Amino acid sequence: MSHAMDDDDDDLYDPADAVPVTNPSDPRGPSADAPMNDNVEEEEEEVEEDDEDDFNIITEAPPDAPPPETSHPRHANLRTESQRPTSADSTSAQKSQTPTLTPKVDTSASVPAGTRPTSQKPGSAYPPVHASNIDVNANPVHPATGKPILMTDMDADFPDDDKPWRRPGTDLTDYFNYGFDEFTWASYVLKQQELRKEVGDQKRQLDDMQNFLTMGLPPMPGAQPGAGPAAVSAPPPMPGMPGIPDMNPDMMQGMLASMMSQGLDPSSMDPMSFMQHAQTMMGGQSGAGGGQQGQGGFGGQGGGQSQMGYGNAGGGYGGGRGRGRRW
């Protein structure tokens, strides 16, 4: 039994560590077995303790080591969710590194008017735009004075003690529009009155000229009563005017052509100037016609008589000379 145990020990442990076994029958060895067996058992226990120290199993982790990970499914899900932002960050970094094409947005409607490209066509190629509702002919009544606003007099209609726009700190825009003040408004009113009067005079002169050119003038002083309506119903002859004989349309056209040849514009002349020029031209033509008639009479009658008298005188002069010679 002891030999079998020794063999097993030899198989498990290194033979170098084994203790040599002495033969009990050897006369040179010790005679007593008990002390020897005790020593062998002590050595075996020491060897077993050394082996157990070599194969110790560590069941507790050191304090510096990280805690062990568990394989719970919930923990696995949390781990994957915590790792998702990292993957999103990596994908965003990759997207930022790779160039991307942005879609082209039409911003023509939101571009300010100052930066819009101008058209190559001129403005005259487009229709006019009517965006104002100002009435240029308006002349409203001033509520304080009861007069049209263009007829209001700052000094007469507003007493000195009732001109609130002169008070210190008063805003003039509360009383005058479009940048006017007391002085510029008075100048504007005078200018408007002069323009209206001038336009009215020109319109009246134009109407008179048109009536004159169409031979529809009322009878002038010295004209026969009823000659004007007769002239309207029957243009030729024209009603008589002071110093101007009756004219038919042909004579009227000739007179207008003569004025235009002299550099005069009949349409821009007032009626009185036109009548004076017409009277001068017609008087000259009448005088020329009378002279021509006188020359005709002189050639046909007076001239013949003079020639005849001159011949008779010549004859008489010759006869007288003859008589003188005879004398």
From Swiss-Prot:
<feature type="compositionally biased region" description="Acidic residues">
    <location>
        <begin position="1"/>
        <end position="14"/>
    </location>
</feature>
<comment type="function">
    <text>Pre-mRNA polyadenylation factor that directly interacts with poly(A) polymerase.</text>
</comment>
<feature type="region of interest" description="Disordered">
    <location>
        <begin position="1"/>
        <end position="139"/>
    </location>
</feature>
<comment type="similarity">
    <text>Belongs to the FIP1 family.</text>
</comment>
<dbReference type="GO" id="GO:0005847">
    <property type="term" value="C:mRNA cleavage and polyadenylation specificity factor complex"/>
</dbReference>
<dbReference type="InterPro" id="IPR007854">
    <property type="entry name" value="Fip1_dom"/>
</dbReference>
<dbReference type="GO" id="GO:0006397">
    <property type="term" value="P:mRNA processing"/>
</dbReference>
<keyword id="KW-0507">mRNA processing</keyword>
<dbReference type="Pfam" id="PF05182">
    <property type="entry name" value="Fip1"/>
</dbReference>
<protein>
    <recommendedName>
        <fullName>Pre-mRNA polyadenylation factor fip1</fullName>
    </recommendedName>
</protein>
<feature type="region of interest" description="Disordered">
    <location>
        <begin position="283"/>
        <end position="327"/>
    </location>
</feature>
<dbReference type="InterPro" id="IPR051187">
    <property type="entry name" value="Pre-mRNA_3'-end_processing_reg"/>
</dbReference>
<feature type="compositionally biased region" description="Gly residues">
    <location>
        <begin position="284"/>
        <end position="321"/>
    </location>
</feature>
<feature type="compositionally biased region" description="Acidic residues">
    <location>
        <begin position="39"/>
        <end position="55"/>
    </location>
</feature>
<feature type="compositionally biased region" description="Polar residues">
    <location>
        <begin position="79"/>
        <end position="122"/>
    </location>
</feature>
<keyword id="KW-0539">Nucleus</keyword>
